[in-house]
Amino acid sequence: VLEVTGSERLEFLNRMLTQELKPGGKWLGPRACVNSFWLNRKGRIDADLRVLVLDGRVLLECDAFAADRTVSGLGAFIISEDATIRDLSSSMHRLSLHGPTASVLLDAVREDSGVPIESLVEHPNAEI
């Protein structure tokens, strides 16, 4: 997981990624999630990203093996923009549950840990 902060984070990412972050002239709002690619100078895919817009920051979820080159590749294009990229991989993790029994498994995890399911869900469109 990579974090992009700064007052020009959305403008910067909008220029660098394949997905439009300002569809219809309006920036994506907090908790919006889109998929995108980061392309290298030859137009080849360097990273397949999930872009999660939050208040004051944007999280880029990518393959762990692509994190370093994505940070250095995108960082090389930050010249005068107010944007900072850092790798949060050592402090954040993601678990995805898919399929018809996903909610049952999540209930079991919650019962074992005592953590409410609602606190585990980050995406507003997630179904519990």
Positions of predicted regions on the chain:
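Basic, glycine/lysine-rich polyanion-binding surfaces/domains
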Residues: 1-128
